[in-house]
Amino acid sequence: LAHDIKTPLTSVIGYLSLLDEAPDMPPKQKAKYVGITLEKAYRLEQLINEFFEITRFNLQTIFLNKGKINLLFMLQQMADEFYPMLTPQGKQVSVNVPNGLTLWGDADKLARVFNNILKNAIAYSYENGVIDIAAEQQDKNIVITFTNHGNPIPQEKLETIFEKFFRLDTSRSTNTGGAGLGLAIAKEIVNAHGGNIFVQSNTEKTVFTVVLPQK
C-alpha cells in the first residue's frame, strides 16, 4: 500500500515543484496544475482511509457506488496526472479510446485499478518508452489494455502476480517500493464488478488486460 500512497504524493511534489520553479507560468496552466495537485492530495487522503478499511473488511464486501463512466475522460485524466513521473525518464502515455465509450461501474474504485496497473507499467518500462492504453467494446464487455515494453515478468510469476504481498521487484529490477497490495486490490475490485483481469508477458512486452461488463 505504501506504493499506492507514494503515487499521488509523487504527483503532488512534482506539480508543486513545477509551480515553484516557474513563477511566471501562464495562469491557465498554473490553474490546471493547482487543480491536479489538489485532486491528488484528496486522493492521498482517500488511500489512507482505504488502508484502514482494508484492514477491517474483506474487499469482496465493499459496497460499489456504480454510475456511468466516460472511459476516455477517466483514462486521459489519469495519464495527465502521471506527467511528473513520466518526464524525468522521457516516458509517455498514449491513450487510444473511442469517444463516447462508457461503462457502468464504481468510478473511484476502477480509477484505483487503472492507477495501479499504469503505475506498474511506468515503473517497469524502458526509458523513453511509450505506455499504450487502449479500450474497446467486445460484445457486452469493455476490454481495457495497458501495454509497456521492458523486462518481462517470468512465466512462473504470472500465476501469483495478483496475490497479496506479491512483489514484482523480486523478478524485475526497479526503484519502486510497496507492500505488494496494489494488484491484489485491483483484482478484488474487478471481480466485484463481475469482470476479470489478467497479464501476458513475453520477450520485452507486458500487457495487462481488464475485462468489465459494460452494464
Model features per residue range: what roles?
Residues G177, G182, A186:
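Short alpha-helical Gxxx[C/S/T] motif in the catalytic ATP-binding
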Residues G194-G195:
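Conserved glycine-rich
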Residues E39-L44:
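Short alpha-helical segment of the dimerization/phosphotransfer core of two-component systems
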Residues A121-I122:
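Short helix-loop "hinge" at the ATP-lid/N-box region of the Bergerat-fold HATPase_c
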Residues N65-K68, T87, Q92-T102:
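Conserved catalytic submotifs in the C-terminal HATPase_c
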Residues N128-K140:
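Short beta-strand/loop element within the Bergerat-fold HATPase_c
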Residues I153-R167:
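Short conserved segment of the HATPase_c
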